[in-house]
């Protein structure tokens, strides 16, 4: 049921983005929860919705994430978290996962009133970092996020976790790895090559 709910949430958010009917991502999450429950013939009480909202703030990170992010940061790369959630929810999630200190910035698409994969959030991230959009590399485990970032002009990397596949109609990311550790290894290798080419 969780996969159905998440898929419905992303679908609702994409429809809103395409049609220009912006709603905060949390509103899509709750609407998708209601739709999924209705499809399953389950009645939701307000307490149930509040419990799901609270759980979204306490999602655990995959085991390799903390060390992979720290390796990237310690190599001198600037890290920013870019999410469709509000900044408040994103900060709560990162705090709970013990990752907040690895990021220079926590950015929300909510700031620009357009959800990813619209180009505005990616461009806002580049602007907040003070770099050109083509100097940003988005790392994501969702093909739609990689597609949006690529269309906005970012370099991309895809975390191909089990069940996650790339859209064959979208330009393939420069980096693909089975988990964030593999992606970090590849990014650091690219950075070393770039350093050797610089005069």
Sequence positions of predicted segments:
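Conserved acidic
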Residues: 1, 21-25, 172
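Short, acidic loop-to-helix structural element flanking the phosphoryl-transfer center
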Residues: 22, 26-27, 44-81, 91, ...
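Asp-based, Mg2+/Mn2+-dependent phosphohydrolase catalytic module
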Residues: 66, 70-73, 86-199
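Hydrophobic side chains within well-formed alpha-helices
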Residues: 1-2, 48, 99-102
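A metal-dependent, Asp-based hydrolase signature
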Residues: 7, 11-51
